[in-house]
Amino acid sequence: MLSTTQSVTEPTEVTSKKVEDIEKENDEETPYSIFTSYDRLVLIVILSLIGFWSTISSPIYFPALPTLTSYFHTSSSIMNISVVAYLIFQGIAPTISSNLADTFGRRPVILASIIVFCASCVAISQTNVYWLLAVLRCIQAAGIAAVISISSGVAGDVCTRANRGSMVGAVAGLQLVGNGIGGLVGAALISSFNSWRSIFIFLTIGGGVTFILAIFILPETSRKLVGNGSVVPKNILNKSPYIYLPHFKKRMNNDITTIVPATRFDLLGPLKIFFQKNVFCTLLPVGIHFAAWTMVLTSLSTELESRYHYSVMHVGLIYLPQGIACIAGSLVVGKSLDWYYRYRKTIYDQEVECLPLDERPQFNIVATRLTLSVVPALLMIIGLVIFGWCIQYKRHIISIIISTILVSFSASVFIAICTTMLVDLYPNNGSGSTSCLNLMRCWLAALGAGVLDSMINAMNVGGTYTVVAGFCILFDLALIYVLHNAKKKFSNSGPTTTKSPPKQ
């Protein structure tokens, strides 16, 4: 159950009160954020670009696996260790670095992440031994993985619940484009330059250009440092040239009353959130959906080469529709989250307007968000079954493309929905709470990638993805438990403030 006892990590009554009091839309005197729609668009673009290099770094590696196996004179099973290790570190690192971002600011941690990423890519492009490649891939993952969860923290800083869905959905969806088209980019680079090293040179150049852009246009948004954005940060690392642009500077009135009280750095903070029952039961379905998507991406290249005898470049082109599906998902889920929030909030306001303040239940934000997860959950299951059996019986390629579109679209939408809900529950710890999601999805993806070959050998492709679809159904049932507990918690709780109706 979502506990109502006071805790630094749980969305308590006290925390909820702060959220309700702070998240006021368009208050003329003290707006929740001075970031306009234009400023949020700039943030969406730069955060999506930064996160793109995190998500593309795993699948861009897949087309190079046969080449790397030959180059390092090793087996495919040994080479797959580098894939699994990458996913493990991609899950672990953000629980530390994203927590640093919640404490010391978003901007310096993001910039440091890009530096580590670029340095590791340069080193990988020059390595000649397998063990060093595997180690450097772990460093690469640890460096860049945190930017995904930090992006969600930024959304919590500058958006209220009413418009948060659009930003989280757009950023999460656009970032996951890298996951969808990574195979295409990797195949194109290998075909064009006939070298696996070109992949990491490409990542270095892309990361370097993004770093330069981030220096100039990525502002600090942590409410513990800049409040609603109107306070100039004290540390030079948190200062961005963007805040000195005339259109932004004129809104900076140094309103220190909007600064959220700082909390001490808690290394285990994200893990405390992770092991809360409701959070854990929300993360399980997200993790299995992402793991299923990763397994599809992994199987796609090997199965199309072995069963359909496609070239590396031809296989790469099959990844393109998945990237388009991610973009479509980001657009659909963001607008849907905001629309459904307004719809449910209107109904709630009508239901409680005649009740005394001390009898009004809290608005059920958990149900408002998770209700929309039903459709992508069904699409994921359908896509997995179609993919597995169409591959096994060598059906027309269009059926496989359609199935991968369903899987990619549903995974990106499902992740965005649950990410938004976590930020809603922990608006002042958005990066840390979202790192829990990253931890679960990466660890389950690592497990899925590790057992994929054994599953296919034991039950063929069709049976494998039918079983994976079954796991998705089983894990999705955990959301029923979450919704049941949320209904009890929000219906039994009192108002968030005794002075005015709760604002969402």
UniProtKB/Swiss-Prot annotation:
Keyword Cell membrane belongs to the record: yes
Polar residues: bias regions: 1-14
A GO MF term: transmembrane transporter activity
Family (UniProt): Belongs to the major facilitator superfamily. CAR1 family.
Region feature Disordered, mapped onto this chain: 1-23
UniProt entry tagged with the keyword Transport: yes
GO BP annotation list: lipid homeostasis; membrane raft assembly; transmembrane transport
Topology Cytoplasmic: residue spans: 1-41, 97-106, 156-169, 220-278, 333-370, 418-438, 484-504
CDD domains cross-referenced by the UniProt entry: MFS_Tpo1_MDR_like
Disrupted-gene phenotype: Leads to defects in biofilm architecture and attenuated virulence.
Key words, A-Z: Cell membrane, Membrane, Transmembrane, Transmembrane helix, Transport, Virulence
Extracellular side: 63-75, 130-132, 191-198, 300-311, 392-396, 457-460
Protein name: MFS antiporter QDR2
Biological role stated in the UniProt entry: MFS antiporter that does not display functional linkage as drug transporter and performs functions that significantly affect biofilm development and virulence. No substrate for transport has been identified yet, but plays an important role in the growth in the host.
Family annotation (InterPro entries): MFS (IPR011701), MFS_dom (IPR020846), MFS_trans_sf (IPR036259)
Protein's cellular compartments: Cell membrane
Highest taxon above the source species: Eukaryota
Main location: membrane
GO cellular component, as recorded: membrane raft; plasma membrane
Pfam family, one: MFS_1
Bilayer topology annotation: Multi-pass membrane protein
TM region positions: 42-62, 76-96, 107-129, 133-155, 170-190, 199-219, 279-299, 312-332, 371-391, 397-417, 439-456, 461-483
